[in-house]
């Protein structure tokens, strides 16, 4: 049985340590989220914020990667997705660490009295245009409810002085997002350009920004080798999560 056929069941995705149901979420578990959750720097992290958690995928991946005393706040605007995220968390090994908030990040963030040293988001990136099949999918895919400038401003208000704000975006949109972040005082510290294989140009980019200036480390990740199997670098990054890797 293929990997995709053996890990997809009951409208969800089974990882080594947890299961993510996503049938009530506009955006399903996919490579973008898995890449971001496996890639984000977690050294010395003390508190995590997941903006737009959806099914709870990123919060769960980061719970697996961090110490048991690290709390994670996961904020989701869509009530159906937030409820499913709560269920996924409840059935995971970390229900005591992850709190799912059904709220708009723009109203939730100003009420917080603590700051986060890791903020993570798989944000919407399409400009409003062609309508989606459902309002929930439109909300998840389009920037009308949370544009990038607002997202960057919220992250700036919530982050510690030496924290990281991490996102995954399509390559060209990521370049524009980076320029916007730099204009707002952020510093780009990590960048990984992601290509499907060696013959193709990068189609996604993983970005980590910080309020603190410092050297920017950049590299390239290829998902599949010439034999169409996962590359060594992609395997090393994600093997703690995929069942059959």
Swiss-Prot record:
Function as written in the Swiss-Prot or TrEMBL entry: Specifically methylates the adenine in position 37 of tRNA(1)(Val) (anticodon cmo5UAC).
Chain's gene name: yfiC
Catalyzed reaction equations: adenosine(37) in tRNA1(Val) + S-adenosyl-L-methionine = N(6)-methyladenosine(37) in tRNA1(Val) + S-adenosyl-L-homocysteine + H(+)
EC number(s) given by UniProt: 2.1.1.223
Cellular compartments annotated: Cytoplasm
Family: Belongs to the methyltransferase superfamily. tRNA (adenine-N(6)-)-methyltransferase family.
This protein's UniProt keywords: Cytoplasm, Methyltransferase, S-adenosyl-L-methionine, Transferase, tRNA processing
Protein name: tRNA1(Val) (adenine(37)-N6)-methyltransferase
MF terms in GO: nucleic acid binding; tRNA (adenine-N6)-methyltransferase activity
């Amino acid at each position: 049985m293929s990997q995709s056929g053996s890990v997809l069941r009951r409208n969800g995705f089974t990882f080594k340590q947890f299961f993510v149901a996503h049938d009530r979420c506009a955006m399903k578990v996919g490579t973008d989220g898995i890449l971001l959750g496996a890639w984000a720097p977690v050294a010395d992290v003390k508190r995590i914020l997941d903006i737009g958690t959806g099914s709870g995928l990123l919060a769960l991946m980061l719970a697996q990667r961090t110490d048991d005393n690290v709390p994670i706040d996961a904020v989701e605007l869509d009530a159906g997705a937030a409820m499913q995220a709560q269920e996924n968390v409840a059935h995971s090994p970390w229900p005591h660490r992850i709190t799912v908030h059904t709220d708009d990040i723009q109203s939730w963030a100003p009420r917080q009295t603590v700051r986060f040293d890791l903020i993570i988001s798989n944000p919407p990136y399409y400009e409003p245009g062609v309508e989606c099949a459902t309002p929930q999918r439109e909300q998840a895919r389009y920037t009308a409810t949370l544009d990038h400038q607002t997202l960057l401003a919220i992250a700036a208000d919530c982050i510690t002085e030496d924290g990281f704000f991490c996102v995954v975006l399509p390559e060209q949109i990521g370049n524009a997002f980076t320029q916007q972040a730099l204009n707002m005082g952020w510093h780009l510290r990590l960048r990984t350009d992601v290509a499907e294989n060696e013959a193709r140009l990068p189609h996604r980019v993983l970005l980590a920004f910080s309020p603190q200036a410092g050297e920017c480390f950049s590299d390239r990740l290829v998902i599949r080798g010439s034999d169409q199997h996962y590359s060594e670098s992609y395997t090393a990054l994600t093997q703690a999560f995929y069942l059959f890797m």
